[in-house]
Structures are given as structure tokens and as C-alpha cells.
């Protein structure tokens, strides 16, 4: 995943920050409790493709996608 791309991506619903979950290959929005898949290195930022997350789901300890 390109670090420059991660710096500019936001949640398409709330425009809030996304957190990169390297293990699950997803970008997670904690505010909306949605996870957007990353397929072949490309984030799929379509609400219809996002999955609902469960509160307390661990996110990659490397932290938010911003600032990388």
C-alpha cells in the first residue's frame, strides 16, 4: 500500500481518518464502524463494498494511515 495514498484517503461517508489494518488488508473508519477492503493493493472505497466492524476490533498497531 502506497504511503502517499494512505495520507490522502478519508472515509467516503464522514470524511474522517482511516486506519490501515495490514493483516486484514482493510482501511477502517472507527466513527462509522466500517472497513473498506484493499484488493491487489487498491483500496475499494465504495460504501457498498465495506463491511460492518465490531466495536473493539483490533487495528494494526502501526496506527492510523495518516502521517506515514
Curated annotation (Swiss-Prot):
Q: What Pfam families has UniProt attached to this entry?
A: Trm112p
Classification via PANTHER family: PROTEIN PREY, MITOCHONDRIAL (PTHR33505:SF4), ZGC:162634 (PTHR33505)
Q: Which SUPFAM superfamilies match?
A: Trm112p-like
* Source organism of the structure: Burkholderia mallei (strain ATCC 23344)
Q: Name one GO cellular component term.
A: cytosol
The name this protein carries in UniProt is: UPF0434 protein BMA2274
Write out the similarity annotation.
Belongs to the UPF0434 family.
Amino acid at each position: 500500500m502506497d504511503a502517499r495514498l494512505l495520507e490522502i484517503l478519508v472515509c467516503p461517508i464522514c470524511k474522517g481518518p482511516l486506519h490501515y489494518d495490514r493483516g486484514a488488508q482493510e482501511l477502517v473508519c472507527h466513527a462509522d464502524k466500517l472497513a473498506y477492503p484493499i484488493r491487489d493493493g487498491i483500496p475499494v472505497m465504495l460504501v457498498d463494498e465495506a463491511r460492518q466492524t465490531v466495536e473493539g476490533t483490533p487495528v494494526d498497531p502501526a496506527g492510523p494511515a495518516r502521517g506515514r
